[in-house]
Each structure stands twice: as structure tokens, then as C-alpha cells.
């Protein structure tokens, strides 16, 4: 192989970041980014720059490759646009890092590709973030756009995703990376187990540098002919000449280990825990081993497919056989209340067994497997990192073993092994990375007499190969063997059986009518029952329960929430919110929906109007409170008025809180005094008034220390020194823009000029100002930012999402929301969803008005009518129909069509199904698949699916509200997950003392038999469909738990019934109540 032998190794120049020369080389970086870099990270950036921006950064996991790549590409920002290719679950963390370290980029300049047709903003964005999952053979529109864009700078994160020469994503990415002028490949495991996995990455950076594939395979992969049965096969899975390969790689790859450059990081301690399995648990596995030995004794006795199928079956049987012992081990670890740890597994059966162990121990946990969406994974990671009550993370080795940070954990348990050391080390370093403050203990559970012992030996052999190739020395997974006597209890573990849905449930596992009659809602013990009391909603009861418990609690900042974990306790709350959520005011309007706010504002404002008259009333004893509606003095323990049954929390005000409140009717004459007088109102009243009259509060320019203190956003005394600064001009007003993809808020001047800084509102609430320059410690700026954070926090998550997606610049988020709402088209539709028939009618009407024709598009782009079709340039056949005759066909068979009827204008441009505007130019339409040209933009696509597809609608609402009821704040999704993952025999106990006890018997038993999300929470229309709220956007939707949804539906049904009766009565006579109305 002459090309390989003639390679001249370029010695890596010795670079020390202590010298002034290296510091001068990094002067181009933003000050904050340069100050954050560690010395070895500066070395990595300079290494790449000296190779003209084409290299591989292969530092060990957890050493900060992301920030190095950002620094490298920033040097070449004049050559952007920049393409960043990452695993799909890391799109948003990468976007967060880009916005954090390059604040000069505006939100509009960063484009996160959402689907295979989302290419409209690619040509106008400076940074494009793309997930590997979209690089498939059918993504023709996306592939064409990537090739046409000609990205000059490319980052490929976790570049070992390109290890296979035959994978579609490798073939798509290879020409894009080769064509780019600068290309940075990032991976902590360039080769997961074999040298063959390096070839595609090297070929992407330097084509033909190591020769052709056959030359490389023969030289470094020990390629040879091998027979599987009678079939010869070219085997490239070996390794040879590894020292030479290591020397050649050092010219294009920089790799540092944590033991070399991060000596202050606490150590990683591995421990191997072998144990014996009970004979009953390993019965099936022993049978498979006998079959395996029979095949191995007979040469050429089985085909490759048979052998691999047997190994896969043994792998799964090993998981089931050791699941009982793994459960006992997890329970043993949970006995230490101070431990937070990760559990990694591969098979769903093992993940299920681990989850059951945590549920049986009544511990809060998170679980990430392949079914969890990318956005939800980030939410779960934040929960584990920040919530001290979430002690266990149950993770899939493949789904959560790369790119995520779990430094809050001090222990890692491997319930199963995997086939290569790369995945194992990646999983280990989720906890052992920069930011870890304690040593990480890693436990490998090895079941003797199973596939584990064989896999452990295989992992060490592969580790020697990868260590020699990447690090220049032989390595193995160093793990001390644990004390056998200490783990003897594992061999006595009970055999575990999968939670099979087809298993027949015993009668004891289901609710019966007798038990249902005995059930009591736990909240009934805290609420006195008068003789005549109307039925109250679950929202009112739960909210009152939280408020009462908040008063009694020693920590007034914590919300007493309902707990679904300790379900056997008679006095436990029903759900436990995240710590972050608990830090907010317990009566914050951000948790209220528009409909709820509307119900609460009216009596509250009325009570303010009556306050003036009550000021002259003398103070009452402490044990009583006065109703503001009927003035009756009630016992302090009653949560509602004994006379008029008005709830104490909504329309009643304590006498001692009614100081200096003016009549609402005088507000118009003295608007300047309103903001000062509102300060004396209680928190709930102040926030409700802020929602009812946002304009006044937004226009108020006086921000007194008292309001700041009430919101928990006080200025530090030491900050008074920042009264003047020459580094930044002082503006009396700031503009803001919310990022579309992260929680960050970008700051602009009042003229709309970007100030190259951004922040996270939650950080400001926690008094963390490190993301902002020191100049923003000025008192004027602090006041403006604090005021923004207060207003922003008062909005619900759904309202914040509306502002983010708008991309607008604004001063006040409340006023911005009002402006966006005004601009939206007001529609009054009593139909729930858009149907294909609605689309067909709209398309035909468009064609009749402006000309053109209609066509039937399907996902397969197959012709539906052989008589009316047109052959496009790329050979795809799409039927073109006559708009005057197709309507009759649709009325005969309205739901048999698998596609949509789309209008095409006279120029041949297909029109958007949502807005009837051209989706693309004619030349592009010929190249694109007809199915990809349904919509003109991602916005129209989302709006269309939200209005026509229930599953898509639920998914989008879930992304924002995470399955938390917006009326009673119950985390219904968490209860669903616990019930789904629990053994069927224990599901009844889980449901027994929760908010679901109000549901009918059959519904409860269905939850036990076959739990689904729809049994626990629903997406409800705030403005009901019958009232004109159908086919709405997300701002008219909210999450409701099943109980609240049922009660709200019943209330709405009663209202509709009354309206119908009144309408019917008005046809035959006049309503007598009209004579009683005062004119």
C-alpha cells in the first residue's frame, strides 16, 4: 500500500497556553468565552487553527469539546454559514451553548431544523443545527437544500455516528464535510471497538489520505476472507499495525484524557460485582447455552443469521434472568437517602425491572429511553440535576448514554453490559465530567454463568484495541472485584417476570363496587362539611388545600403539593412539583388559564371596590374572617362563607389586608396613584389585577423596593456603587427578544440595536447575573431587567411560547402578548378539527377564483387516477383532477382518500394547504416530492397539524406544560408513568389514595389493565368548541387532569342545556326573569 507508507507525519507543535503568544492567538474570542476556557481547551483551539480548521477533537468525554468547537468556528465566522450536525437529542443543548457563548447572534440567525421539509430559513440563517435522525433516504428536500447551501464551516458532533460505510447518514454527510473549507469532528470515542470505524471520519476530513478502503482495511483492520458456513465473507473486524495508525492519527486528531489534563477532577472508581443466579431464573438461558455449545462443536454447522439470532436471544434472556437480582441491588442502594445514582440498561425488560424497584421503594425517578422525545429529555435531565427528591435516573445505554450531563449523581450502576467499550465509557462519563464535585463509583453487575462473563472479556479485548489506536497504549476496563460475601444476597433474589399486558389480573388487583363505596377523598378530612353545601370543583379544593398548608408550613416559599409517591400515607399531598416550580409564588397567575383567570378576576376586583366601605369597620377577632360579599363573620377554619358559600380564597379579603385600597371607579381619575396603592394589596390580588389591567402595570415607571422584595427580586446592597459607568451608554428603555429554541432572552436598545448579551429569567430570579456584562449592574438596567422578569414570570408557559414563536422585539411581555393576540385572526368555529374534506373544498374554491387545477397528493406520490395524471421531470406521477367534477366524488366517498387535494396555480406552483400561498417555485417543485410541497413554511405546517391532528396537538401541548393540570397543578403525566411502569398487582395501591379516586369504577380498572396518557390528562379548549373555539391554535388549549376535565365538561354540558331550554322557551313565550331585570 504505497500511499499509506508514503505518508509523512507532521509533528504536533508544542503549544503552551502559559505563553503570551498563545494568549494573543485567542484574542479574537469574546472576552467571556476566552476567560472560561481551561488551558488544555486553549491548546485544542490552537491545534485546530494551525491545521486550517480541519481536524478531529477526540478528547475524553466530559472535557468540554463543545466549547472548543465553538471557539474554533468563531475564528472563521466570516466564512459562515455554519452547519452543526448532532444527535437529535442534543439539538437544543447545542443551540443553548451557541447563544450563551456567541451572544452577538440574534435568535433569527440560528435555525434548528425540525423536520425533513423545514428548509425555508436555511439560506438566511448564519447557524443551522441538524439532527442525525433527519438524514434518511426519503429526505430528498432536506438533502438537496444541504447540498445547495454549500456550507463552508461544519461541526460534526459525536462523529462516530459516521462509523459505518453503508449507513445512509454517512453517505449523505461525507460529501458535505468534504466540500466544506473548515470541518471539526467531535467525539470522545472515535472508534467504539474496531479500527474500521475510523475510516469514514478520516475520509471526511482528508479524502484518500490513508488510501482507499481496501488498502486501509488490509493495513489496519487485518482484513481477510472468512467463512460463515459455506459462504465466504470479507472480514474487516480485526486490528493490525495499531502503533503506526496511532502515529498517523496524531497529525489530524488531538486527544487528551482526564487523568492527564484534569487532575483536580475526583477519581472514577470501577467495581465489578459478580453473583450467582438462582437455578430457576437461568433455566431458559441454560437451554440456549446448550444450543450454542452444540453449534460451536460442529464446524460450519450454522449460517451467520442463525448464530447471531441465537446470541441476541441469549442477550435478552440474560437480562430477564438477572432482573430480580438487579432489583434487589437497587433497593439496597436506595436505603441510603443521600445517594443519587444512574442505572444504565439496554433491554426494555431490564429498564422495566429497574423502574419497578424504584416505584416499590416509593422514590421519585426519571426514565429516558428511545420513546422519550428530545425536548422532554432535556426537561428530565434538568429535573434530575436540580430536584433533590429525584434520586434515580433509569437510562437506556443508547438513548441517554451520549451528550447528556448527570453530574448530580455520585454512583453509576450498569444493570447490563453492551457490545463495545465505547458505549460503556460514554455512559460512565455522563456523571464523570467537568462539574462533578465527588468521586464517581461505577458498579458493574455481572451474573455468573450468563452472557455477561463472555461480554466482559470481549469488552476488555476491544478496549485494548481502541486504547492502542487512540491513546498509544493498551488499556482495559479496570474494575476491582467486590467482596463476594457482601453480595451473596443477590443469589437468593426472586425470579422476575416481565409485566406482560396479556396476563390475567386477579380480582384483588382491581377495584370493586364495595371498595369504591368505601373510598374517600383524602382532602375530605381537611374540609368541614356543612348541611347544605354545593359541590365544589377539584381545582377550588386543591387550591384551597395548598393555600391552607402553605400558611401552616414553616417554609412559606414552598408550595404544599400533592404527592403520588407516598401513596400509603393518609396525610401526604397528592403530587410533588419540581423544586424550581416550588420556588415561585403559590398563587402565581402563571399557573392559571385564561378561563380560570376570568372567573377569579371579577369577584376579586369587586372586593377591591367594596374595600373602601369596609375600611371604617373596626377590626374583628383573630378567630373570625368577614365575607366581602355578605359581610358575615365566619369561623377561621371555614374555607368558604357559611351564608353565601363564597370561597375564602377568591372573593374574601382579610380585614387586616384592606389598608389604603382605592375604589376601582376612581382609577380613571388618578392613574398616577394606582401603581403606588396596588403595592399594599396582597400577592394574589396584585397579580390578578396585573392580569386584568396589564397596560397600567406595564406603563408604571416607578419600581419601588417593596414590590421588588415581594417578587423576590431585590437589588443587593453592594450594587449601589454601580451608579455610573463609561463602558456602556445608559438607556432609559430596553427592548427584548425571546429565543425560539431556548430559555434565553436577548437584549436590544430602544432603537432595536442588538447589545450582544442575553440572559435566562430564572437566573435573574436566583440573583445570578454572570451571563450579563458588568455594565448591567447599573441601577437603571437592573430595574428594567427585574421588571421584565416579573412580567415574564407572570405569564403561563403557553403564553411565553406564543411570544417566543413570534420573534418580536418588545419592551413589556404583557403588552407584546396583547399585540400578538390582536394581530391573530379571530375565528368563530364550532368544528373541532380540519378534515380532508375541508381542505378539498378550500382548494377547489381557490382554483375556481384564481384559476389553475387541483391535484391529489399522497405520501407515496402514487397516481390515484390513471386517466388524469401528469409526469413530472423526476418521474413522479401525481394525479391532476378537474375541480368541477371532483366534488361529487368526495361526497360519495368522503374519507377513503389517503391524501390531500391541493390547489396548483396557473404557473404550476403548488399552494399551501393552510394559507393557499405558493409553497415553492416551479423548478423546485419539479425536483421536490409532491408530498414535501404541502406547506409554504414550518409555521403553516404546525398550525395545520394542530388544527387537524389530535396526536400532534397533544404532543405540542405536552412540550410546553408537561402533563401538569393547569387548574389544580396535579402532575398527571408523572402518575401515568409510575402506574405504567409499576407491576399490575401494585397499580391498585398506587391509585387508591390519589386524585383519581373520584373517577368511575370502570375507568379506574381500565387504568390498571391498560394505562394510557388519555386516562390521566386531556387537552381541553379554554374557549369551548361549542362557543366558537374549534380549530384553534395553542393559545386556546390547556392541560387538564381527568377529574378537572370531567367536571368542566359536565359544567359546560349543563350550561349548554340551559341555553337550549331558554332558546326553546323564547320561541313560545317571554322569559319571566326579564321582568325582574332592573332597567
UniProtKB/Swiss-Prot annotation:
CDD domains to which the protein is assigned, alphabetical: DEXHc_HARP_SMARCAL1, HNHc, SF2_C_SNF
User: What is the protein name for this chain?
Assistant: DNA annealing helicase and endonuclease ZRANB3
What residue stretches are annotated with the Helicase C-terminal domain? 325-481
Q: Does the keyword Zinc apply?
A: yes
UniProt motif PIP-box: location: 519-526
Describe what happens upon changing residue 522 to A: Abolishes interaction with PCNA
Q: Where is the composition biased (Polar residues)?
A: 590-600, 713-725
Q: What gene is behind this protein?
A: ZRANB3
Q: Which GO terms describe its molecular function?
A: ATP binding; ATP-dependent DNA/DNA annealing activity; DNA endonuclease activity; helicase activity; K63-linked polyubiquitin modification-dependent protein binding; zinc ion binding
Family membership, please give it: Belongs to the SNF2/RAD54 helicase family.
Q: Which residues carry this modification: (Microbial infection) S-methylcysteine?
A: 630
Write down the species: Homo sapiens (Human)
Q: Region annotation Disordered: residue ranges?
A: 582-601, 689-725
The residues covered by the Helicase ATP-binding domain are 46-208
> What function does this protein fulfil?
DNA annealing helicase and endonuclease required to maintain genome stability at stalled or collapsed replication forks by facilitating fork restart and limiting inappropriate recombination that could occur during template switching events. Recruited to the sites of stalled DNA replication by polyubiquitinated PCNA and acts as a structure-specific endonuclease that cleaves the replication fork D-loop intermediate, generating an accessible 3'-OH group in the template of the leading strand, which is amenable to extension by DNA polymerase.
Gene Ontology terms: cellular component: nuclear replication fork; nucleoplasm
Consequence recorded when altering residue 1021 to A: Does not affect endonuclease. Abolishes endonuclease activity
The Swiss-Prot or TrEMBL note on domains reads: The PIP-box mediates the interaction with PCNA, while the RanBP2-type zinc finger mediates binding to 'Lys-63'-linked polyubiquitin.
Query: What more does the entry say?
Result: In contrast to classical helicases that unwing DNA, annealing helicases rewind it.
- How does it associate, per the subunit comment? Interacts (via PIP-box and RanBP2-type zinc finger) with PCNA (when PCNA is polyubiquitinated via 'Lys-63'-linked polyubiquitin).
Boundaries of every HNH domain copy: 1011-1051
Q: Where does ATP bind?
A: 59-66
Amino acid at each position: 500500500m504505497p500511499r499509506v507508507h508514503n505518508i509523512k507525519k507532521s509533528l504536533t507543535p508544542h503549544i503552551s497556553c502559559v505563553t503570551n503568544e498563545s494568549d494573543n492567538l485567542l484574542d479574537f474570542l469574546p472576552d467571556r468565552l476566552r476567560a472560561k476556557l481551561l488551558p488544555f481547551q486553549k491548546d485544542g483551539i490552537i491545534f485546530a487553527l494551525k491545521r486550517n480548521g480541519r481536524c478531529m477533537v477526540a478528547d475524553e468525554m466530559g472535557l468540554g469539546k463543545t466549547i472548543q468547537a465553538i471557539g474554533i468556528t468563531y475564528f472563521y465566522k466570516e466564512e459562515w454559514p455554519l452547519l452543526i450536525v448532532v444527535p437529535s437529542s442534543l439539538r437544543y443543548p447545542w443551540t443553548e451553548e451557541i447563544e450563551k457563548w456567541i451572544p452577538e447572534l440574534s435568535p433569527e440567525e440560528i435555525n434548528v431544523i425540525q423536520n425533513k421539509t423545514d428548509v425555508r430559513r436555511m439560506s438566511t440563517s448564519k447557524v443551522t443545527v441538524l439532527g442525525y435522525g433527519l438524514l434518511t433516504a426519503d429526505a430528498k428536500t432536506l438533502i438537496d437544500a444541504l447540498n445547495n447551501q454549500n456550507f463552508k464551516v461544519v461541526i460534526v458532533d459525536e462523529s462516530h455516528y459516521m462509523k459505518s460505510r453503508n449507513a445512509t447518514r454517512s453517505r449523505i454527510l461525507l460529501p458535505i464535510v468534504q466540500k466544506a473549507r473548515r470541518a471539526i469532528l467531535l467525539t470522545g470515542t472515535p472508534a467504539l471497538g474496531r479500527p474500521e470505524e475510523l475510516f469514514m471520519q478520516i475520509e471526511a476530513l482528508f479524502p484518500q489520505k490513508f488510501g482507499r478502503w481496501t488498502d486501509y482495511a488490509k493495513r489496519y483492520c487485518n482484513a481477510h476472507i472468512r467463512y460463515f458456513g459455506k459462504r465466504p465473507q470479507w472480514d474487516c473486524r480485526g486490528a493490525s499495525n495499531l502503533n503506526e495508525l496511532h502515529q498517523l492519527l496524531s497529525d489530524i486528531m488531538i486527544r487528551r484524557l482526564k487523568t492527564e489534563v484534569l487532575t483536580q477532577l475526583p477519581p472514577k472508581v470501577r467495581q465489578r460485582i459478580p453473583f450467582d443466579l438462582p437455578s430457576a431464573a437461568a433455566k431458559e438461558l441454560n437451554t440456549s447455552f446448550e444450543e450454542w455449545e452444540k453449534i460451536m462443536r460442529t464446524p460450519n454447522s450454522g449460517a451467520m443469521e442463525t448464530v447471531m439470532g441465537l446470541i441476541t436471544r441469549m442477550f435478552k434472556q440474560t437480562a430477564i434472568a438477572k432482573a430480580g437480582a438487579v432489583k434487589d441491588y437497587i433497593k439496597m442502594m436506595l436505603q441510603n437517602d443521600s445517594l443519587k445514582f444512574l442505572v444504565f440498561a439496554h433491554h426494555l425488560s431490564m429498564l422495566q425491572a429497574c423502574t419497578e424497584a424504584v416505584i416499590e421503594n416509593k422514590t421519585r425517578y426519571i426514565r429516558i429511553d428511545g420513546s422519550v422525545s428530545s425536548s422532554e429529555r432535556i426537561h428530565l435531565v434538568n429535573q434530575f440535576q436540580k430536584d433533590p427528591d429525584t434520586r434515580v435516573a433509569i437510562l437506556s445505554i443508547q438513548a441517554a448514554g451520549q451528550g447528556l450531563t448527570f453530574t448530580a449523581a455520585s454512583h453509576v450502576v450498569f444493570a447490563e453490559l453492551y457490545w463495545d467499550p465505547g458505549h460503556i465509557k460514554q455512559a460512565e462519563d455522563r456523571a464523570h465530567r467537568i462539574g462533578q464535585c465527588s468521586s464517581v463509583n461505577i458498579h458493574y453487575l455481572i451474573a455468573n454463568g450468563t452472557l455477561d462473563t463472555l461480554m466482559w472479556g470481549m469488552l476488555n479485548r476491544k478496549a485494548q484495541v481502541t486504547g492502542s489506536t487512540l491513546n498509544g497504549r493498551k488499556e482495559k476496563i479496570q474494575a476491582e472485584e467486590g467482596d463476594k460475601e457482601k453480595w451473596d444476597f443477590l443469589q437468593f433474589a426472586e425470579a422476575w417476570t416481565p409485566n406482560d399486558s396479556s396476563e390475567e389480573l386477579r380480582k384483588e388487583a382491581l377495584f370493586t363496587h364495595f371498595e369504591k363505596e368505601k373510598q374517600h377523598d383524602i382532602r375530605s378530612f381537611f374540609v368541614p362539611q356543612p348541611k347544605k353545601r354545593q359541590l365544589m370543583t377539584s381545582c377550588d379544593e386543591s387550591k384551597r388545600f395548598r393555600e391552607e398548608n402553605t400558611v401552616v408550613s414553616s417554609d412559606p416559599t414552598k408550595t404544599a403539593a400533592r404527592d403520588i409517591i407516598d401513596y400509603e400515607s393518609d396525610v401526604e399531598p397528592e403530587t410533588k412539583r419540581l423544586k424550581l416550580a416550588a420556588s415561585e409564588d403559590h398563587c402565581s397567575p402563571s399557573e392559571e388559564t385564561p378561563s380560570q383567570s376570568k372567573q377569579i378576576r371579577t369577584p376579586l376586583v369587586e372586593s377591591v371596590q367594596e374595600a373602601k366601605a369596609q375600611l371604617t369597620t373596626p377590626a374583628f377577632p383573630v378567630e373570625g374572617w368577614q365575607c366581602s360579599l355578605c359581610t358575615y363573620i365566619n369561623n377561621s377554619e371555614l374555607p368558604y362563607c357559611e351564608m353565601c358559600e363564597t370561597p375564602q380564597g377568591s372573593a374574601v379579603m382579610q380585614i387586616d389586608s384592606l389598608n389604603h385600597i382605592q375604589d376601582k371607579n376612581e382609577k380613571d381619575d388618578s392613574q398616577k396613584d394606582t401603581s403606588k396603592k396596588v403595592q399594599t394589596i396582597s400577592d394574589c390580588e396584585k397579580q390578578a389585577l396585573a392580569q386584568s389591567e396589564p397596560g397600567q402595570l406595564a406603563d408604571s415607571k416607578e419600581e419601588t423596593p417593596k414590590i421588588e422584595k415581594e417578587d423576590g427580586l431585590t437589588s443587593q446592597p453592594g450594587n449601589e456603587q454601580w451608579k455610573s459607568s463609561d463602558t456602556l451608554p445608559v438607556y432609559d428603555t430596553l427592548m427584548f427578544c425571546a429565543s425560539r429554541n431556548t430559555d434565553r432572552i436577548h437584549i436590544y436598545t430602544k432603537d432595536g440595536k442588538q447589545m450582544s448579551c442575553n440572559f435566562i429569567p430564572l437566573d435573574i430570579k436566583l440573583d445570578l447575573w454572570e451571563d450579563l456584562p458588568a455594565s448591567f449592574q447599573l441601577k437603571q438596567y437592573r430595574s428594567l431587567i427585574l421588571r421584565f422578569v416579573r412580567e415574564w414570570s407572570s405569564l403561563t408557559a403557553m403564553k411565553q411560547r406564543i411570544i417566543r414563536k413570534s420573534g418580536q422585539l418588545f419592551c413589556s411581555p404583557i403588552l407584546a402578548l396583547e399585540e400578538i393576540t390582536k394581530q391573530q385572526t379571530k375565528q368563530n368555529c364550532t368544528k373541532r378539527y380540519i378534515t380532508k374534506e375541508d381542505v378539498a373544498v378550500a382548494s377547489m374554491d381557490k382554483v375556481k377564483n384564481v384559476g389553475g387545477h387541483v391535484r391529489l397528493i399522497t405520501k407515496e406520490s402514487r397516481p390515484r387516477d390513471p386517466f388524469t395524471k401528469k409526469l413530472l421531470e423526476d418521474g413522479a406521477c401525481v394525479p391532476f383532477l378537474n375541480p368541477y367534477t371532483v366534488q361529487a366524488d368526495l361526497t360519495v366517498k368522503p374519507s377513503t382518500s389517503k391524501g390531500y387535494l391541493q390547489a396548483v396555480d396557473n404557473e404550476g406552483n403548488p399552494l399551501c394547504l393552510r394559507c393557499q400561498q405558493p409553497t415553492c417555485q416551479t423548478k423546485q417543485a419539479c425536483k421536490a416530492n409532491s408530498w414535501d410541497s404541502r406547506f409554504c413554511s414550518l409555521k403553516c405546517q404546525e398550525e395545520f397539524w394542530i388544527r387537524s391532528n389530535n396526536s400532534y396537538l397533544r404532543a405540542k401541548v405536552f412540550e410546553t406544560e408537561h402533563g401538569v393540570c393547569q387548574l389544580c397543578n396535579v402532575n398527571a403525566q408523572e402518575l401515568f408513568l409510575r402506574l405504567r411502569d409499576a407491576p399490575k398487582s401494585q397499580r391498585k395501591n398506587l391509585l387508591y389514595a390519589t386524585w383519581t379516586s373520584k373517577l368511575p369504577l370502570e375507568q379506574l380498572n381500565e387504568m390498571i389493565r391498560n394505562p394510557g396518557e388519555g386516562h390521566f390528562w386531556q387537552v381541553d379548549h379554554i374557549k369551548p368548541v361549542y362557543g366558537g373555539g374549534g380549530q384553534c391554535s395553542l393559545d386556546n388549549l390547556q392541560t387538564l387532569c381527568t377529574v378537572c376535565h370531567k367536571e368542566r365538561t359536565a359544567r359546560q354540558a349543563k350550561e349548554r342545556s340551559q341555553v337550549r331550554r331558554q332558546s326553546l322557551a323564547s320561541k313560545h313565550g317571554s322569559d319571566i326573569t326579564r321582568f325582574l331585570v332592573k332597567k
